[in-house]
Swiss-Prot record:
Function: Catalyzes the rearrangement of 1-deoxy-D-xylulose 5-phosphate (DXP) to produce the thiazole phosphate moiety of thiamine. Sulfur is provided by the thiocarboxylate moiety of the carrier protein ThiS. In vitro, sulfur can be provided by H(2)S.
Keyword presence, Cytoplasm: yes
Protein's recorded name: Thiazole synthase
Lineage: Bacteria, Pseudomonadati, Pseudomonadota, Gammaproteobacteria, Alteromonadales
Catalytic reaction list: [ThiS sulfur-carrier protein]-C-terminal-Gly-aminoethanethioate + 2-iminoacetate + 1-deoxy-D-xylulose 5-phosphate = [ThiS sulfur-carrier protein]-C-terminal Gly-Gly + 2-[(2R,5Z)-2-carboxy-4-methylthiazol-5(2H)-ylidene]ethyl phosphate + 2 H2O + H(+)
GO terms, molecular function: thiazole synthase activity
GO aspect biological process, one term: thiamine diphosphate biosynthetic process
Enzyme active site: K95 (schiff-base intermediate with dxp)
InterPro entries linked: Aldolase_TIM, Thiazole_synthase_ThiG, ThiG
Record-annotated membrane-spanning stretches: none
Record-listed 1-deoxy-D-xylulose 5-phosphate binding positions: G156, A182, G183, N204, T205
Localization (cell): Cytoplasm
Keywords from the named record: Cytoplasm, Schiff base, Thiamine biosynthesis, Transferase
Organism for this UniProt entry: Shewanella sp. (strain MR-7)
Length: 254
């Protein structure tokens, strides 16, 4: 069971709501994934009514909403978006995203740390999207973040665990859950992240842009479960030299 800020999750697959062709397909895919934590971009919500066609079906599905600050270019904008989410959605949870460069969507480490500190002081449950930087993740943990979300590769690229060496370091040292976010493009990527010891993964593009999002959601669900079970079972040690599985000469001596 995964626990974040005192809340237990049976599923270690978190999902997003963007890029689906319809709200109905989004909802059916989320149900198929069995995800219990779903991200929602504040920039997609009608600021006048506090709702859109996303929120009602998601609430009916019983998932926990994780509003994100995607689109924020600095700490000030991210803090504003988080406060807006708390007021409109009634949640302290926030996925902190600050990426001023619209081309590569790389997270701004300096602004993210500053915003995280302020939001934690204001009582938010902060889950920051960041580079796979072990030092930065330690700093975010120290200011009170409930989890850290290092990227596997750039958002939406489906490149997989490009940052694997650094993710391993983060997992090794972290005292809060590590959720691998961004760039996970195949169920095998998700399984591998879980085999490394990640606490969860967040997947959006790979499911939403699939020819069959519902089927792909099922695949990711199974992959995450298998990867976690493999980690808990204990994977064999990787070696450079061959190791025989049975005696090579015993039968010759008989």
């Amino acid at each position: 069971m995964l626990t974040i800020a005192g809340v237990e999750f049976e599923s270690r697959l978190f999902t997003g709501t963007g890029k689906f062709s319809s709200s109905q397909l989004m909802l059916e895919s989320i149900k198929a994934s069995q995800s219990q934590l779903v991200t929602v971009a504040m920039k997609r919500i009608d600021l006048k009514t506090g709702a859109d066609d996303l929120l009602s079906p998601l609430r009916q599905a019983g998932v926990r909403l994780l509003p994100n600050t995607s689109g924020a270019r600095n700490a000030k904008e991210a803090i504003f978006a988080a406060e807006l989410a708390r007021e409109m959605l009634g949640t302290q949870w926030v996925k902190l995203e600050i990426h001023p460069d619209p081309k590569y969507l790389m997270p701004d480490a300096v602004e993210t740390l500053a915003a995280a500190k302020t939001l934690c002081e204001r009582g938010f449950i902060v889950m920051p999207y960041v580079h796979a930087d072990p030092v930065l993740c330690r700093r975010l943990e120290e200011v009170g973040c409930a989890a850290v979300m290092p990227l596997a590769s750039p958002i939406g690229t489906n490149q997989g665990l490009v940052t694997e060496p650094f993710i391993k370091m983060i997992i090794e040292q972290a005292k809060v859950p590590v959720v691998i976010d961004a760039g996970i493009g195949a169920p095998s990527h998700a399984a591998h992240a879980m085999e490394l010891g990640a606490d969860a993964v967040l997947v959006n593009t790979a499911i939403a842009s699939s020819a069959s999002p519902i089927e792909m959601a099922l695949c990711f669900k199974d992959a995450v479960n298998c990867g976690r079970r493999a980690f808990e079972a204990g994977l064999g040690r990787v070696q450079t030299q061959a190791v025989h599985t049975s005696p090579l000469t015993g039968f010759l001596q008989q």
